[in-house]
Every structure is written in structure tokens, then in C-alpha cells.
């Protein structure tokens, strides 16, 4: 149920009947304050200006054509021409019933699209670190939301699995006679990478052999391809452990590494030359883009092939966008890549559009994000100033959560305690990130993220268990409750019901903008409204059975909405804390 969309269409029709153009925007928004109703139409100002009349006068005319019978109990004009809409309690009650009768809580399925989501993208032969966390969990929340809405989502893990470093790694693997690389763990492989690099820098004979191996690998020699595959498999097997711990839906099947596009690069360069978009410049192949200027104010040159014949990330990203449209048949492509890559992506996509590889009707969207900072406001590092490994961060989260839940539940059995600590610890790390606007940097703070108050995972998980506990005490079966009507008489009942019915609107924003923090804010607000409702509208001690069961149904929809909302974020819920 999308009340905002329903009201927007009703107000738009009334505006057209009052003389507004057919493309007018009613600008219906959820009201910021209760006194302004549940929704507010703010579009009169802009339209009245075009019509040469006072906004309030237009609002009055719109009201004469606006039929919200059975939807709103009151509609009024406020200020210079805002239209405040107060939803009818009977309308709310009816739709709460409908939401409870549906597995999807009344959420409609939009027109199905094929959406490619590019996220996570770790590098081969390196362990995942905190720099991979944001892309991985924000991208996964977007994927979960889009899939819930019914879209076909293709996860694309753009792994860094190609490049000159593989010659060096294969040469070192050979030198160490570690043919059985499958048994190596990634922690060893990380040290292995460092040793290989040191050797490469210090031993010219070894470096020369490594360079020859790159050529052999790139020419498709089976022995070198097999060695390369071993390195990729070891890395991704270890990364899968991290994905599983993070409750992220990526699997080995979602790997679409840089190597996938490698065979396409010569054809891309040749085609861009044939189309007159790429030219030779100082031995390299370059595309000059008018949209981007260099320091001298001239069109910026984007290199797609170096003098030595090597290709660049831009070339790969051009091939990648083309592949996603032509082969994967994407209707929309989302990239969860940090904000520092913005200009690079914009340049690659400008070339993609000019070459006609992806039509303008298919959006390529950079859902960029800021950095994770320590309490000192600087990039998050270890005490020694090194990069924090993701596995170490999750270990610490688990350890801190273990202490926290053991303190609150001294008699809980060990296996139950471990399960709860895992849900709280991993949930806390993820929610702390997801609850912030992805476009900004955020401060990583253990105390804040593990707090049981405020917009945190432990608070949300506790809020969910609190609602469930009402049912345990009520001792009523679901069938009995299903037959009971919903009656809304109190203001707090109406406020909670209206917010519950805004779940679909929240999902729609997250799906459109790729902003999971909007879902976090919604769920936190919902938990707060339930708290106020619980305090002021007795449930178990209600004046009669009819009111008791009606309030239990509002509690039931609250629990289902919290659980489903947290699930779209990849946050685990628990039944007891």
C-alpha cells in the first residue's frame, strides 16, 4: 500500500480540474509534524505562480475538486497554500487488516526490471579490510530491497583478479614449490604477496621472469591460467567466510572479475577508433571529452590504451558497462563504489554513451559513499597505523557483544549466548554503517554502536523482542486474532497505524536512491511510536476484549514490519534478549 502515490494521483487530478497543466507536480509528502496531518501537498506554490494566481486561491479551488471520501477524515489549507491531509481511522484500520493478511505486508510489486548491482569488489591475493565493508553491506541492503520488491537482481562482484601482479605471484608460487596452493590460507597468502613483491623489487632476474609470466598468462597459456585460478579460488573461498559472517548474500557464482572483460578490450579500442572517438596521442590511444576540462581549460584526454599496448581501468569499465547492457540485459545498473572514483566512472560512462554502447534510457548510477573514520576523525586504522582486516574487526565485534549479552543474561546457556552475541555484534557493525547517509564519512565508535539506546542495532533488536513478549503474555493464537477487527479510536493508535502503512513508501525510496539509512530511520521512528502507544494505550489490560485484540493486531503488524525491515538491511533479529 503506497498512500503517498494514491494521494498524489488524487491531488494531481484535482489540480488539473482546477486549471493546472497535465504535468503538474502535487508534491505530496509525509507531514513532518502531527498538527499538519499525515500528509501535506506542497505543489500549489509552483503551479499558482505559472497560473498567475495566489497559491491559497489555487488550493481552495483544488479542494472543491478533491474527493478523498473514505481516505481522509479532514483536509485543510494551511499557511500560504499547503494542503494538509488527515487520514480516516476507518481507512487506516482497513489497510492494517489487509497488511496483516499478506506475507508482503501489503507491499505491491512494481514493474519488474533487471537490475545489475556492482558491490564489494575485493582484490585477489589480499585479505578483505575495513575499506570493503561499506560497499559490501550497503550494496547488499540495496540488493535485498530490490529483490523483495520483485526485481530480477544480478549481483556483480567486480573482483580485482587481473593485472601485472599475477606474473609476480605465479613466479613466487613456483619458486616456493607450493603447487598445492589450495591448502594455503589467505593470511599466508597476504604474507606471500608481500614476500613476492619484495623479491620482485630486489631481484631483477625474478622480476624479468614475472614479466614473461604475465605475457604467458594473458596469451591464455593453460599452465599459467591454472596457477592464476588457484590464487583466485583461495581468495574467494576465504572471502566467502567473511560474507557468511556478515550475513551478506554474495556467493562464488556472483564473481564477475576484471578478467571477464579482458578479451573484449582490443575490440573496444578498435571500435572507438573506428567511430572517431579515440585518437592516437603521444603513442597512446586517447578519448578527448568536452565535458571534462584539464587545468588549461581544454578537453580532458582519457587514455584507454597505453603506449606499451596495456589497457587501463577505464577501458575495463567501458567494456563492463557494455557487457551489462548487451549480455545481461540490464534495465538499470548500480555501482556501490567510493566517492573517490566518481570522476573516473563519469568519464568511462561518457565514452559509453557517446559510443552508443548503453542507451540513455538505461541509468548507470554511482551510489557513492564516504569513508569510515576513527574517533580522531582520520581514516580508521589499527593502533600501529595499519589497515584493519575485516575478519579482525568482526572478531572484536563478537567479543564485545559476548561480554555485553553475558552481563545482561548471566544464566543463558552457552550456545544460545553465542548465537545472540553473533546477532548483536555483527548487527551492530552493519547497522552503525547502514543508519548513516552513505554519501557522508562516518565515525566508527564501538560504544555508540553497541548501545541499547538510540538508533542502533541492539536497540532495534530489543524493540522487536519487546513487541514479541506482548504476544507471549497475551496467550492468543494467530487464528483467533485474525478474525478480530481493527478499531482505531486513539490518536496514538492512528499515528502508529499510519506509520506502519508507510513501509512501502520507505522501501520505494531505498530502491530508488540506494539509501538504507532511510529504512533505519523509519524503523527507529516506528519503534519509538510503538513505545508511546504501548505506554498510553494498554494492550493486555485494555477495557474490553475487542480493544485488546485490536491493539494486539497493531503490535503484530509492528513486529512483522520491524522484522521484514531489518531483513532488507541484512540485520538478524532474535526472539529473546
From Swiss-Prot:
Compartments it resides in: Cytoplasm
Ranges spanned by the short sequence motif 'HIGH' region, renumbered to the chain: 122-132
Q: Which GO terms describe its biological process?
A: arginyl-tRNA aminoacylation
Q: Which UniProt keywords apply?
A: Aminoacyl-tRNA synthetase, ATP-binding, Cytoplasm, Ligase, Nucleotide-binding, Protein biosynthesis
Q: Name one GO molecular function term.
A: arginine-tRNA ligase activity
Q: Which GO terms describe its cellular component?
A: cytoplasm
Q: Could you say which EC number(s) this protein's record lists? A: 6.1.1.19
Can the keyword ATP-binding be found in this entry's annotation?
yes
Question: Which reactions does this protein catalyse?
Answer: tRNA(Arg) + L-arginine + ATP = L-arginyl-tRNA(Arg) + AMP + diphosphate
Where primarily located? cytoplasm
Keyword ATP-binding listed: yes
Q: What class of enzyme is it?
A: ligase
Q: Do you know which InterPro entries this protein is assigned to? A: aa-tRNA-synth_I_CS (IPR001412), Arg-tRNA-ligase (IPR001278), Arg-tRNA-synth_N (IPR005148), Arg-tRNA-synth_N_sf (IPR036695), ArgRS_core (IPR035684), DALR_anticod-bd (IPR008909), Rossmann-like_a/b/a_fold (IPR014729), tRNAsynth_Ia_anticodon-bd (IPR009080)
Matching entries from PROSITE patterns are given as: AA_TRNA_LIGASE_I
> In which family does this protein belong, per the annotation?
Belongs to the class-I aminoacyl-tRNA synthetase family.
Q: How does it assemble?
A: Monomer.
What is this protein's name? Arginine--tRNA ligase
Amino acid at each position: 500500500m503506497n498512500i503517498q502515490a494514491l494521494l498524489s494521483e488524487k491531488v494531481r487530478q484535482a489540480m488539473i480540474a482546477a486549471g493546472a497543466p497535465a504535468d503538474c507536480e502535487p508534491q505530496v509528502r509525509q507531514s513532518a509534524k502531527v498538527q499538519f496531518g499525515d500528509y501535506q501537498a506542497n505543489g500549489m506554490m509552483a503551479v499558482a505562480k505559472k497560473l498567475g494566481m495566489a497559491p491559497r486561491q489555487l488550493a481552495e479551488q483544488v479542494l472543491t475538486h478533491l474527493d478523498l471520501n473514505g481516505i481522509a477524515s479532514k483536509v485543510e489549507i494551511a499557511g500560504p497554500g499547503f494542503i494538509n491531509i488527515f487520514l480516516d481511522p476507518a481507512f487506516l484500520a482497513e489497510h492494517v487488516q489487509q497488511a496483516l493478511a499478506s506475507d508482503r505486508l501489503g507491499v505491491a510489486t512494481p514493474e519488474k526490471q533487471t537490475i545489475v548491482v556492482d558491490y564489494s569488489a575485493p582484490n585477489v591475493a589480499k585479505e578483505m579490510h575495513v575499506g570493503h565493508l561499506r560497499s559490501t553491506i550497503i550494496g547488499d541492503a540495496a540488493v535485498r530491497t530490490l529483490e523483495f520488491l520483485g526485481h530480477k537482481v544480478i549481483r556483480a562482484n567486480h573482483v580485482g583478479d587481473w593485472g601485472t601482479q599475477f606474473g609476480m605471484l605465479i613466479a613466487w608460487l613456483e619458486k616456493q614449490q607450493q603447487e598445492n596452493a589450495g591448502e594455503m590460507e589467505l593470511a599466508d597468502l597476504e604474507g606471500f604477496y608481500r614476500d613476492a613483491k619484495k623479491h620482485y623489487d630486489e631481484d631483477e632476474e625474478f622480476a624479468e621472469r614475472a614479466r614473461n609470466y604475465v605475457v604467458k598468462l594473458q596469451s591464455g597459456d593453460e599452465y599459467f591460467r591454472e596457477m592464476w585460478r588457484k590464487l583466485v579460488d583461495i581468495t574467494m573461498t576465504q572471502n566467502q567466510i567473511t560474507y557468511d559472517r556478515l550475513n551478506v548474500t554474495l556467493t562464488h557464482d556472483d564473481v564477475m572479475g576484471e578478467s571477464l572483460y579482458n578479451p573484449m578490450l582490443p575490440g573496444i579500442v578498435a571500435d572507438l577508433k573506428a567511430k572517431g572517438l579515440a585518437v592516437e596521442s603521444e603513442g597512446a590511444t586517447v578519448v578527448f571529452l568536452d565535458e571534462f576540462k584539464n587545468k588549461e581549460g581544454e578537453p580532458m584526454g582519457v587514455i584507454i590504451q597505453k603506449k606499451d599496448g596495456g589497457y587501463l581501468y577505464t577501458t575495463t569499465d567501458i567494456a563492463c558497462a557494455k557487457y551489462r547492457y548487451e549480455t545481461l540485459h540490464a534495465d538499470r545498473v548500480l555501482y556501490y563504489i567510493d566517492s573517490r572514483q566518481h570522476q573516473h566512472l563519469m568519464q568511462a560512462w561518457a565514452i559509453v554513451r557517446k559510443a552508443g554502447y548503453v542507451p540513455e534510457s538505461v541509468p548507470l548510477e554511482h551510489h557513492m559513499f564516504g569513508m569510515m573514520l576513527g574517533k580522531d576523525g582520520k581514516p580508521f586504522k589499527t593502533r600501529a597505523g595499519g589497515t584493519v582486516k575485516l575478519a579482525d574487526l568482526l572478531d572484536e565485534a563478537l567479543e564485545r557483544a559476548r561480554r555485553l549479552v553475558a552481563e545482561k543474561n548471566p544464566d543463558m546457556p552457552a550456545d544460545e549466548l553465542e548465537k545472540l552475541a553473533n546477532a548483536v555484534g555483527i548487527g551492530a557493525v552493519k547497522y552503525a554503517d547502514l543508519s548513516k547517509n552513505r554519501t557522508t564519512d562516518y565515525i566508527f565508535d564501538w560504544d555508540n554502536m553497541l548501545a541499547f539506546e538510540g538508533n542502533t542495532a541492539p536497540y532495534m533488536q530489543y524493540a522487536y523482542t519487546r513487541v514479541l513478549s506482548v504476544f507471549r503474555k497475551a496467550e492468543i493464537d494467530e487464528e483467533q486474532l485474525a478474525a478480530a477487527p481493527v478499531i482505531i479510536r486513539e490518536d496514538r493508535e492512528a499515528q502508529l497505524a499510519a506509520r506502519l502503512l508507510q513501509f512501502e513508501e520507505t522501501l520505494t525510496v531505498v530502491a530508488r536512491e540506494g539509501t538504507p539509512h532511510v529504512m533505519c530511520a523509519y524503523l527507529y521512528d516506528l519503534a519509538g511510536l510503538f513505545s508511546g502507544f504501548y505506554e498510553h494505550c494498554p494492550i493486555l489490560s485494555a477495557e474490553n476484549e475487542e480493544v485488546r485484540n485490536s491493539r494486539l493486531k497493531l503490535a503484530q503488524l509492528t513486529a512483522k514490519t520491524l522484522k521484514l525491515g531489518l531483513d532488507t538491511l541484512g540485520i538478524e533479529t532474535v526472539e529473546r534478549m
